[in-house]
Structures are given as structure tokens and as C-alpha cells.
Swiss-Prot record:
It is found in: Cell membrane. Pfam families: FUSC-like, FUSC_2. The lineage of its organism: Bacteria, Pseudomonadati, Pseudomonadota, Gammaproteobacteria, Pasteurellales. This is Uncharacterized protein HI_1680. One of its GO terms (cellular component) is plasma membrane. It is a multi-pass membrane protein. Keywords: Cell membrane, Membrane, Transmembrane, Transmembrane helix. The chain crosses the membrane at residues 9-29, 60-80, 83-103, 136-156, 391-411, 506-526.
């Protein structure tokens, strides 16, 4: 079905239809007094809506209803018993938060169950004789949303995964745009500063790839694979290859740009990268608009012009063979990117052998329990967040029960939605929540002047609920504004005095926000558990594993198997984790002043290492078709394995042994470069030698960084 609707619009269709049905039911059966739990049940269902194939969605609905039933009924039975209720909510908060250790899907349903417990409390009316009516109405709302979303899925089965692929190519386009800045001849002196921005863009690409991988994993588990899923799988593999090619570095950008700055070649390389970035964005547009992608011939002409310019440059610089090989390798990678972009415009299918997606999936009660208990340490951010949030929930419940605040559990609702695992995210969410609530209260105070009918109120409930979901993922202030209006309208529909709810809503939000800020600032704050050294160790080890897989495949022949892609993904994920850690630290420059500069130096260092390794990875295609000489086999692989060993154990090696190992590696590489080779052999084998040389030059800098870390820790212990 070629219906061209924005993915965000499609994602809000289920809540729009479900709330419309609920509104008609409330009006027809005259059950205004139960409107709020029914609507909140729909919202809770939307909060845990997870993309999956049809059978996976049915399983999600089944487990969601079970989790919501347990949460809602057990809370309903303890409302009115202050001590029991406070203890119950505290325990539920800790358990539901820790379940997040198992994976994103468990985390989403667990958080939804906690929200349902709060919704059950907020909609509790002591005067109602039927004790189970609130949980039943919440579950009816969730079931209604689930049925509607399954029907909508049948009309748009692949749009979520298509949108995730579109976002990946959008991130890839921005990445290539940033890469092109390295070939700006007028900004040679600024190249060093651009590495940080490039690393951040790389982290965005990795995040987008992870979302695509998870979406595809759940789509290709079944026997039948939709043709569009196969197409998205092909796009995903192409994006990965483009990323590896673009991430490859064969030279010092500053040196090569300085040499080329008075030629047209550097301008052509920059323009080619910009056009390739534009092609990625055109792929994004074609996926979002559900149109075929057409390869832009300008990109091909730009490539041919660049190759012609290089031929002229080579004819004038025949003595600079090393430099020519570097540029030729860069152009080979740009040609490969062009090929990937061109073949995406053609109707081909990915082979079954390549169609393997790996994602972490924990199954079995024993494994799930083991994973959860492995986080029972204050070194785990999840455990700190679970304990912190549990204390906050306990405090909020105690305040409400002790002071008997009217509608006081809005304090608790605010803290649960605002309190995030780290300080920076909480601070942003706090500001957005307060702004949205204030605007909502101001606009809500004007509603009584409209003197709306029940039909108009229900229509506004539909509108505000839909807009809440539309803005939920990209503008939390707007979503808070619309949910505040929705709550005030629901109070009016139920027959309560809306004016009496305005100030409690505002004051409770402010109090909840203050408690959340205090919690993340003083209860096991991030700065006390700085993970920079840990993340840097993980990043370096994953780089070593990535290099090991590349060397193995160079030695025994390329096979783009699952293990290689997992190693590559892990290296990029830990690089992204390092980037994210520094980004969070940079948001609090006063607290992390002592760590920031060396952290950014390490980030650039790790990114250089990863780009040098990626260049070898991209070279596997050529090596597969070459006859490796005995001279190359006996020289290259032993020294490569020494480098891998050094990377894996760099923080453990004594200084004297490291210096000896470094000298041995450098000596071997110099001997290899002096070996007699034909011009053809030099053109083929010089790049692997060169990449090992580049990696070797980084080893002393890595060793110096980790040596300082060890010395600092020893001094701290004394």
C-alpha cells in the first residue's frame, strides 16, 4: 500500500482512533465518571507500544496486559492503607526499574506497569463502591489501544522499520557532510578541532544503526520475510559498508590537505563527499515519502571528474609514490560508496547467507535473574537509578500521606517521569516539564470561559491526547502542555471543579521537580562514579578485537560473516559510549574540569585508531583476490599480532617491556618497508604496512594515558 504518510502521523493514528472510540463510548453509555481511567489506560498502552512483527506484537500485548493487571489490582487493593501503600510503591519502583537490565523491551513494559500503578492511584475515588472499576477501565483502555494498533499495523506493517532505516541514512548523510569538512583547503589549521564533532556524528550513526538492527532482528526471525523487509536489510548492510569506508583513514588529514590545497583535486574530493551525503539524505526522503530512490547522476560525474583530476595530479608527482597510494586508496573507498549508493537504486535482493542480524537477547528465567543481579552494585548506573528513584517514590508517598495533599500524587507522577538515570538528562526534562505545565495551566484556566458542551470536551480530550503522543519523542515541553490540558479536561468531564485542580497541578509539578533535582544532585550523583577510565578500557579492547577479526580475514580470506560485523559494531558502540560519556561530562564543565581535556584527547586518539583499523577492514575486498607473497605472510601477520597483543594488554604491561615491544614492532615495520618489492606489489601491500605504522604511532600515546590513570589511582589509594 503506497500511502504517503509521515511516520510520526502513522504512529499517532492508533491513539487518535482509540481515544475517539473511548469518547464515543463515554458519551453513548453516559459513563463520564469513569472517563479518566479509560483514557489513561489508552495512554499507558501507547507508552509501551513496541515495534515487532504480528506474532511478536500479539505476545507483547499479552504480557503487557498481564503486567498491567498485576500492577493495577495490587495497588488498588492497598490504596487507603498508607504504610502498606508506601512500601508497595517503593518495592514496585525498584523491581520495575531493575527489570530494565534485561533489555529495552522489558524496560518499556516495566516502566509502563509503574505508570499504570500511578494512574490507578490518581483515578481512585473513595466514594465508588465497586473497588475494581478503576483497574478494569484502565485495562479496557489498554486493550482498546492494543486492538487498534494491531489493525493499523496491518495497513502499515513496515513503516516503523522503514523510518528507522531512513533515520540511519540521515545520520550517515550528516556524517559524510562532516567528513567533507576535512578537505576544506581554507580550514587546514582548524582540522584538529573537527575531530570531536566527527566523533559525535559517528556516535549518532552508531545509535541509529542499533535501532535499525533491533527492528530488523524482530522482523526476520519468522519463516516468512516480507519483500520490503529484505529491501531494508539490503539498505542496512549498504549503510554499514558506507560507514566503514567513510570511517577509514590512511593519512594525516592536515598534511594531505596542506599538500593539495592549491590543486582542484581537494575541492573535487570535498564536493564528492558532499554529494554522497546529499544522496544519503535523498534515500532518507525516498523512504519517508515511500517513493523509489533514484541515483543522482551528478554523483557519478563528480567521481569521474575527481578520478580525472587525480590522473593529472599523479602525472605531475610521480616521485611521491606513498602520497599517491594514500590518495588512490581514499578514491577507491569513495568509488565503493558510489557503488553502494548506485546499487540501492536497483531491485536486487540480499542473499540468505548475508541476511543474519545479531542482537543481544536474554531468555530463560535463570539468565534473566543472573543479568539483573549482576547490576546489584553502585557501579551500575541502573542500580543507582533504581535505588534513587525508589527513595524518591518513598519520600513523595510519605509527603502526600502525611500532609494529606489534595491530588498530591501528581508529585509522584512528576518525579517518575522527570527523574532520569543521569543529571544532565534530568535537568533538561525538568525544565521542559515545568514550562509545559505552566503553559498548560494558563491555557487550562481559560477553558471554563468557553462553557464547552460534553461533546466539545470529549473532542478536546481526543485532540490533546493525540498531540501528546505526536510530540512525546521530540518535544517534551509540548507533550507536557497537551497532557496537562488533557488532565484538566478529563477532570471537567468527570464533573470535578477544574479551577480547583489548576494550582495543585502546578505546585505538585514544581515540588516533584525539586525533589527530582535534589535526588540526582545528591543521591549517588554521576560525578562520584565517573566511568571514563572504564569506558576507555572497553573501547580499546573492542578496537583490538576488531583488528584481530580483520587480520584473521586478511590472512584467511574475506568472509563478511556475523562475527566480523559483531566485532565491528562493538568497536563503534564503545567509541560511541566514550563520546556520550564525554558529552555528558561537557554538560557539567565545572564538576568535570579536571577530566575534560584529557578525555577529549583520548576521544580523538581512539577515533584515530578506529579509523585506521576501519581502513584495513575496507581493504579486505582487495586482499581476497590477491596472491599474498611468502615475504608478506612471514612479515605482516606476526607484527600485526604483536600490535593486537599490545592493545589488549596495554594497561598491564610494565614500562620497560612496553618500550621493548614498541621498539620491536617499529623495527619490524621498517624492515618490511625496506624489503624489495615490485611496483605492483608495493601498490598492493603498502597500505596494510602503512596502516600498521599509523596504529603503532598511537601506542605510546595510549600507554601514556593509561599509565597516568594507574598512577593517579595509586596516589588516590595512598
Amino acid at each position: 500500500m503506497n500511502i504517503r504518510l509521515n511516520a510520526k502521523v502513522i504512529s499517532t493514528i492508533p491513539v487518535f482512533i482509540a481515544v475517539n472510540i473511548a469518547a464515543v463510548g463515554i458519551w453513548f453509555f453516559d459513563i463520564s465518571s469513569q472517563s479518566m481511567p479509560l483514557i489513561l489506560g489508552i495512554i499507558a498502552g501507547g507508552l509501551v507500544d513496541l515495534d515487532n512483527r504480528l506474532t511478536g506484537r500479539l505476545k507483547n500485548v499479552f504480557f503487557t496486559l498481564i503486567a498491567f493487571s498485576i500492577s493495577s489490582f495490587i495497588v488498588q487493593l492497598h490504596i487507603g492503607k498508607p504504610i502498606q501503600y508506601i512500601v508497595l510503591m517503593t518495592v514496585l519502583t525498584f523491581i520495575f526499574t531493575m527489570i530494565g537490565a534485561v533489555g529495552q523491551r522489558y524496560s518499556t513494559i516495566a516502566f509502563g506497569s509503574l505508570v499504570v500503578a500511578l494512574y490507578t492511584t490518581l483515578t481512585y475515588i473513595p466514594e465508588v463502591n465497586v473497588w475494581f472499576i478503576n483497574p478494569v477501565m484502565i485495562l479496557c483502555g489498554t486493550l482498546l489501544y492494543s486492538v487498534v494498533t494491531l489493525i493499523v499495523y496491518l495497513f502499515f506493517p513496515n513503516r516503523p522499520v522503514q523510518e528507522s532505516v531512513a533515520k540511519a541514512f540521515c545520520a550517515l548523510g550528516e556524517y559524510l557532510d562532516t567528513k567533507s569538512c576535512f578537505f576544506d583547503p581554507d580550514e587546514v589549521a582548524e582540522i584538529e578541532k573537527k575531530h570531536l564533532n566527527f566523533a559525535m556524528k559517528n556516535a549518532n550513526v552508531v545509535t541509529a544503526f542499533n535501532i535499525v538492527r533491533t527492528a530488523l532482528f524482530y522482523r526476520i526471525r519468522g519463516q516468512h520475510r516480507h519483500p520490503l523487509t529484505q529491501r531494508m536489510l539490503r539498505y542496512y548492510f549498504a549503510a554499514q559498508d558506507i560507514h566503514e569506508r567513510a570511517n577509514s583513514t590512511h593519512f594525516d588529514y592536515q598534511q594531505i590537505t596542506e599538500k593539495l590545497k592549491n590543486t582542484d583535486l581537494i575541492f573535487r574530493i570535498q564536493r564528492l563527499l558532499e554529494l554522497q551525503a546529499q544522496s544519503c539524505k535523498e534515500i532518507t526522503a525516498s523512504l519517508r515519502e515511500n517513493k523509489p530512490y533514484h541515483f543522482n547522476k551528478r554523483v557519478e560525474r563528480a567521481l569521474l571528474g575527481t578520478l580525472h583530476s587525480f590522473d593529472l595530479y599523479r602525472a605531475q608527482h610521480l616521485n611521491d609514490q606513498d602520497e599517491l597510494i594514500d590518495i588512490q586508496t581514499l578514491l577507491d573507498n569513495l568509488q565503493s560508496i558510489n557503488w553502494q549508493l548506485r546499487q540501492l537504486a536497483q531491485d536486487t535482493t540480499v542473499t540468505e547467507q548475508l541476511a543474519q542480524i545479531h542482537t543481544e537477547q536474554i531468555t530463560g528465567l535463570k539468565n534473566i535473574s543472573a543479568v539483573i543481579f549482576s547490576h546489584f552494585t553502585f557501579e551500575s548506573p541502573l542500580f543507582r537509578h533504581a535505588v534513587r528513584l525508589s527513595i524518591v517514590v518513598f519520600l513523595c508517598c510519605a509527603i502526600v500521606e502525611f500532609f494529606q495533599f489534595n491530588l498530591g500524587y501528581w508529585i509522584l507522577l512528576t518525579t517518575v517521569f522527570v527523574c532520569q538515570p543521569n543529571y544532565s538528562a534530568t535537568k533538561v526534562r525538568l525544565r521542559q516539564r515545568i514550562i509545559g505545565t505552566i503553559l498548560g495551566v494558563v491555557v487550562g484556566s481559560l477553558l471554563p470561559y468557553l462553557n464547552p458542551t460534553l461533546e466539545l470536551k470529549l473532542g478536546l480530550v481526543v485532540l490533546t491526547s493525540t498531540l501528546f503522543f505526536f510530540f512525546r519523542s521530540n518535544n517534551y515541553s509540548f507533550s507536557t502542555f497537551f497532557i496537562t490540558l488533557q488532565v484538566l479536561l478529563s477532570f471537567d468531564v468527570m464533573g470535578f471543579d477544574t479551577a480547583a485542580a489548576l494550582m495543585p497541578r502546578l505546585l505538585d509539578t514544581l515540588l516533584g521537580a525539586a525533589i527530582s533535582w535534589f535526588a540526582v544532585s545528591y543521591l549517588w550523583p554521576d560525578w562520584k562514579y565517573l566511568q571514563l577510565d572504564k569506558v576507555s578500557h572497553q573501547a580499546l579492547r573492542s578496537d583490538a578485537v576488531y583488528l584481530l577479526h580483520i587480520i584473521s580475514q586478511l590472512q584467511f580470506g574475506k568472509s563478511d560473516d556475523l562475527k566480523y560485523r559483531i566485532a565491528r559494531r562493538n568497536a563503534h558502540q564503545y567509541a560511541a559510549a566514550l563520546s556520550t560519556t564525554l558529552s555528558n561530562m561537557n554538560n557539567e564543565p565545572v564538576k568535570y574540569k579536571a577530566y575534560l581535556q584529557k578525555g577529549f584527547d583520548l576521544l580523538k586518539l581512539n577515533y584515530s585508531l578506529l579509523s585506521y583499523i576501519s581502513a584495513l577492514g575496507a581493504y579486505r575486498d582487495r586482499m581476497k583476490n590477491l596472491q599474498q607473497t611468502a615475504q608478506f605472510l612471514s612479515g605482516f601477520y606476526p607484527v600485526a599480532k604483536k600490535i593486537i597483543y599490545t592493545l589488549e594488554h596495554i594497561e598491564e604491561i610494565p614500562e620497560a617491556i612496553f618500550n621493548q615491544q614498541q621498539e620491536s614492532i617499529e623495527t619490524h615495520l621498517k624492515e618490511l618497508e625496506k624489503q624489495e618489492m615490485t611496483a605492483e606489489e608495493r601498490a598492493v601491500f603498502s597500505l596494510p604496512y602503512q596502516q600498521l605504522n599509523l596504529i603503532t604511532q598511537l601506542l605510546p600515546q595510549f600507554y601514556g594515558y593509561f599509565k597516568k590513570e594507574i598512577n593517579c589511582q595509586s596516589a588516590g589509594a595512598l
